[in-house]
Amino acid sequence: MEITTQEQYQTTMWKGGTTRQIFISPADGDLAARRFDLRISSAIIELTESDFSDFTGFTRYILPLEGEITLLKDGRRIPLSHNELYRFEGDEAVSSENTKGAIDFNIIVRHGIDVEVGIVQDECFSDSRKTVVFALEDISIDGELIGKHDTATLAKPFCLKGKAVIARFSE
């Protein structure tokens, strides 16, 4: 199991704030060139309004970690829940209204890639698919502690204690 703390995440600036890349597959993937299958990130949003970038050919998932985020899509206002990933297609025109300094969690998956994503709590997994576990609170995996907003990556059966977002896939 590989543990990555939030201080180790690759950080970049964007027009609306700061993004921390948590995971990308393949490892040499390139966000700007859209050359990746799966990318997991978290953004600190400094603007109170922002537009989502076009990711045609990808499916997106978003979860607010801190603050409030409301999506504007097809003339509708969609307040996001802190307990449920919201799914939308990367080619949809989506903007958001946020509390200043809101923090979100994002998963972007290329169409055709089989990825299981979800929020789990106190679960065991019996297969060896590659799994990225993002801790929504202090958690443990097979007894090893993982801090809030840190990540564990593993490819073996495991038991999780606590609440986390998972992305499970075959490489």
List the predicted regions and their residue ranges:
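Jelly-roll (double-stranded beta-helix
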Residues: 1-171
